[in-house]
A protein has these predicted regions:
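Hydrophobic membrane-insertion alpha-helices, especially the h-region
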Residues: 5-19
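N-terminal hydrophobic targeting signals that begin at the initiator methionine
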Residues: 1-3
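Compact, glycine-rich, soluble single-domain proteins
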Residues: 17-128
Length: 128
């Protein structure tokens, strides 16, 4: 019984710290199709891999922008993603495609979406 309590407590603390770190990240304002969004900035491999996984709500941002150092085809998925996302594929600040990525709860399985052409930025907007 004590092991279960310790594991549960550890998991709770880990998720709390993770949530705190995500909500305290750098943000930028980014305009897409005449609307300005406040976006969390991700510019490292670890952040690219996590994205908005395990996030159920963002208090200080509309979504996330992934800044990549190169232009190549991108693939995103909804593993452990609990919010619906509008995905914008961007090449040199021009939107080159858009996809919808449902939450894992709605899709009942992992869904993959791919950029139609190489992209050096990807924006995920939480779709309420």
């Amino acid at each position: 019984m004590n092991k279960i309590f310790v594991i549960t407590l550890f998991l709770f603390l880990f998720l709390t710290v993770l949530s705190f770190k995500v909500n305290k990240k750098e943000t930028i304002n980014y305009k897409i199709k005449n609307k300005t969004y406040k976006l969390l900035v991700t510019d490292s491999l670890v952040e690219w891999e996590r994205g908005l996984m395990d996030i159920r709500k963002l208090n200080n941002a509309d979504g996330m922008i992934f800044l990549f150092p190169d232009k190549k085809p991108r693939v995103f998925w909804n593993k452990n993603t609990y919010v619906d996302l509008d995905i914008y594929w961007i090449f040199n600040d021009k939107v080159v495609g858009r996809d919808f990525l449902p939450s894992i709860n709605k899709s009942n399985g992992v869904v993959y979406v791919s950029s139609p052409v190489p992209a050096n930025k990807v924006v995920e907007i939480i779709n309420n």
